[in-house]
C-alpha cells in the first residue's frame, strides 16, 4: 500500500476580517461552494461564462471536447492573448493606468502605462516579423527581470510566435539544450543583468550556447549594463536600433484556442529538461480568472509577485494574469537582500504595494535576517499576502502573517505547477478560513483526488497519498514539446486516466488539502511512510533553525535513515548539544518514529535558481556518493554542494 502517514498536527485557524470579506469578489464559504459545485456539474457552462469576459474574434463551437489526457478547450474559438492584455484596456480609461512598475537592482525606475506597453509590444512584434518570425516559429527569451522581457513575450503572442523563456540565471549549456529542443529561430538577450551588485554575463553565455545550438538566425540584444560585449555582425542586433526603425502598429493574429502559446522547460530529475507546452484559449481564460479571484484583484491594487519571468509563476502571475485583469504589476530585477535585507520592504512602501506574492524560501530567509528589517518599514499598504513554489511550514506562515501582514492580511497558500498553468488549490481570501500549512480547497473546475498505490481513494484524513486531478481544466499542459510519449509516461501512466502531480497530499475533515512534498521525497522508515515536509516543519519550528531539508539514506535495519541538513539563524552556533536538542524536539513534536538519525549543520542548502531545495542532490550526498548524477543546470551555487561533500 502506497499511503503516507501524516503526523504533523496543526490546529490553528485564522479568519479574514469582516471588512475584507465584505469587499471580496467571493464573500463566503457558501458562495464558493455554490460556484464550485456548478463548475464541476456544468464545466462547459461555467468556463464559457468566464471566457466570455474576454475578447474573442470568433466564438467557440464547443467549450470542452474530449477528456484527459487530451482535452480540447474552446474549440473553434479564435482570440489573441496580447489583444486581451493590452488593446482591451487601451480602449478604456485604463489606457493611462500604470501597467508595469519596474525597479532595477541599482535603483532606477520605469513606469509603462497600458498605452506605452501596447505601443512597445506592437513595435517589437514588427521587429520579429522583419527578422522573419512567422506564426508557429519559436523565439527564445534569455533576459534579466526587465520590462523588455514582458514586451518580448507579449510581442510573440501578438503574432502567434511560440516563446520559450529561459531564466537568466541558467548557464550556457542549459540555454543551448533549451534552444536546440525548441529549434528557436531568434534569441532575445541582453548585454548583461545586475545581481547582488555584480553583472551576469548573458551575452557571453548566449554566444557560448549558440556554438552548439545552430537553429538561431538572429540575436536581439537589449543594452542593460553598457558593458562591452562580443558581436557577430549580421546575426546580432541592438534592441533599441531595431525598435527605432519599427512602426508602432501591428494587428494581432487571430489564434485558434488550441494553438501553441509558449513552451516552458521544467527540469526532470534525470535526462533532458521537459518542454511543457501551453496553448492559447484555455491558458488565457484560467490565468485571468485565478488572478482575479485568488488575489481578489481590484482596479486600485498595486500587485507584486516577486518571481522571475523565467518561471511559470512569472508567466502566469507577473505578466499574463495581472495584465489580462488590467492591473498594475510590479517587476524588480535584483536580489531580496541587495544592498540590504530590507530591499523588498522598501519596494512595498515606495510603490504602495497592496498584494504581495512570494516563495516560502524567501520568507524563511526574511526570518533568518530578523524582524528588525521589516520593522523599519510601515508595510501598511498591504492587504493580501500569498505564497508559491513549495509547501510553507506553519512556523514560516505565522511569521509572515504576524510580522509582514501585521495580523490583518489574509494569506493565500497556492499549490500548482508549471504543468497546471495556473493555481489549482488555494483558499479564496474573502471566503475561507486559513489553516497554516494547508494550501486550502480546489479552485473552480479543479477535481483533486488522493489515491494510494492501488489507485484507491484515501479517505482517512490522517493519511496521505498521491495528489491527482481527475477532470480536465483549461490551463493544463497539452504535451511535452516534441515528445508525446514522455507526456503520457510522466503524467498519466502512474494512475491511468487521471493526471498525477508527483506530489503527496492529505485532505482533512473540512476538505482542506495539505501538500506533503514530492512523492519521491517520501521516507520509508521501518515500514512507515513519512513526508519530509512534516519533519522539516518540526525542525524549523525550533527557535535556532532557519531552514531544514530532510532526506533518507539507505539503512540496513530501518530501510531508510532520516538525515536532516540544517542551517541556523544568526546568533546560533552548531554543537553536538544542539543536535541532540533538535532530535529530541522532532520526537516531541511528531513522535519518536520521525527522530532524525543524523543532523548535519551547513551554512547553506543547495537550491535551484527559483529557490527550491534540491533534495535529490542531498540524497546523493547523504548516501556518501562522490559523483553527483543527473541534471544540475538549475543549481544556483555549486560551491554549496562541494562544501557539503567535504563535510560528509
Swiss-Prot record:
Task: Name the residues that bind CoA.
Answer: 195-198, 313, 337
Residues that hold ATP according to the record: 389-391, 413-418, 503, 518, 529
Query: What catalytic activity does the UniProt entry give for this protein?
Result: acetate + ATP + CoA = acetyl-CoA + AMP + diphosphate
Check the record and name the PROSITE patterns matching this protein: AMP_BINDING
Q: So which cofactors does this thing need?
A: Mg(2+)
Q: Which GO terms describe its molecular function?
A: acetate-CoA ligase activity; AMP binding; ATP binding; metal ion binding
Where is coiled-coil annotated? Answer: none
Which InterPro entries does the protein's record reference? Answer: Ac_CoA_lig, ACAS_N, AMP-bd_C, AMP-bd_C_sf, AMP-binding_CS, AMP-dep_synth/lig_dom, ANL_N_sf
Amino acids binding Mg(2+): 540, 542, 545
Q: How is it modified after translation?
A: Acetylated. Deacetylation by the SIR2-homolog deacetylase activates the enzyme.
Q: What is its EC number?
A: 6.2.1.1
Which named protein is this? Acetyl-coenzyme A synthetase
